[in-house]
Structure formats: structure tokens, C-alpha cells
A protein has these predicted regions:
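Active-site helical microenvironments for divalent-metal-assisted chemistry
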Residues: 1-168
């Protein structure tokens, strides 16, 4: 599948329609978060349409009524796999969900980059920094070794964000 600008724009539209009525951080339309994740990728010089399309769709299986198969049919296997790999598994609580999800994310280097962009956006713009700080060692331990070298700057940035949190 060719990841064109047109397909990226279609992914944004699908995401906007699918997330309609949802909010981010209880006050913003959900597309703010989607756009934040896209901007994080661009800031770290990750500008391929494949990654930007996956960013536009990264929460669509988890939070909306779109299935893996629908994502695959319209956006291709690679995009569907990335989105699936960052989609939380079922669990009794957040800790169990993450414990089940992180190995799946770690199996796909592009999904790791996508998850890093998601986490950076959540820490920079969301109100849940304490929760993410508590999870950070397990999160990094599960994903760091399989992270492409080109994305190590994203880990450095996360380290800095959480260091600042300790000061404040």
C-alpha cells in the first residue's frame, strides 16, 4: 500500500468522525490529542506518511467502534498492526492492561515509536503526569531495548520531562 498525503488526510477525517463526541483531558475535543501525537512525531523528524497515518488512527480500535479488520482494509496491514500493537488489552485494572499490552507494543519497532509519541503528548499536554511517572520504569523497561536507535531522543525527552516533574 502506498502511504500518500491523500491517505493521511483520509485517516485524519476517519479519526475525527470516529472520535466525535469524545474529549481529551475532559475539556478538549479528542482531535487535540491526535494532533499533539502527530506534532510530536514531526518534532522528532518522523514525518513519513505511514507513521503520521498510524498516529491519526492510534486510538481508533481502543476507543471507537472501528475493528482491526476495517483499519487493515482501508489503511493496510502495517498501519493496522501498529494501531493494534498500541491498543490496550483487556484487564482488571490499568496495571494489568499495560502488563498485557507492552509486550505486544515491544514486538513492533514502529509501534514503539508511536507509543513514545503518544506518551510524550500525554505528559506534555495531559493532566496525568503522576500516573505516567509511576509507570515509567516498567514502560521503559518493556520497550527501550527494541526501540530503533533513531528514536532514542524520544526516550531522552521523556526522561527530561519526568525529571522536571520531580523538581516541581
Amino acid at each position: 500500500m502506498e502511504y500518500t498525503d491523500k491517505l493521511f488526510n483520509e485517516a485524519l477525517l476517519v479519526s475525527e468522525l470516529a472520535h466525535r463526541g469524545q474529549s481529551y483531558d475532559e475539556i478538549f475535543p479528542y482531535m487535540k490529542h491526535i494532533n499533539d501525537v502527530i506534532e510530536v512525531l514531526k518534532r522528532f523528524d518522523i514525518k513519513s506518511n505511514k507513521m503520521l497515518i498510524a498516529a491519526a488512527l492510534h486510538d481508533i480500535i481502543e476507543d471507537c467502534a472501528l475493528s482491526y479488520n476495517k483499519v487493515k482494509r482501508y489503511f493496510g496491514h502495517e498501519i493496522a498492526e501498529m494501531v493494534y500493537c498500541v491498543t490496550d488489552e483487556l484487564g482488571r485494572d490499568r496495571k494489568e492492561k499495560k502488563r498485557k499490552t507492552l509486550p505486544k507494543t515491544a514486538s513492533n519497532p514502529d509501534a514503539i515509536i508511536l507509543k513514545l509519541a503518544d506518551r510524550i503528548a500525554n505528559i506534555e499536554h495531559g493532566g496525568k503526569i503522576d500516573m505516567y511517572a509511576k509507570e515509567y520504569q516498567e514502560f521503559k523497561g518493556a520497550l527501550f531495548l527494541n526501540t530503533p536507535h533513531s528514536a532514542h531522543g524520544m526516550w531522552e525527552h521523556l526522561d527530561e520531562l519526568l525529571k522536571i516533574k520531580e523538581i516541581v
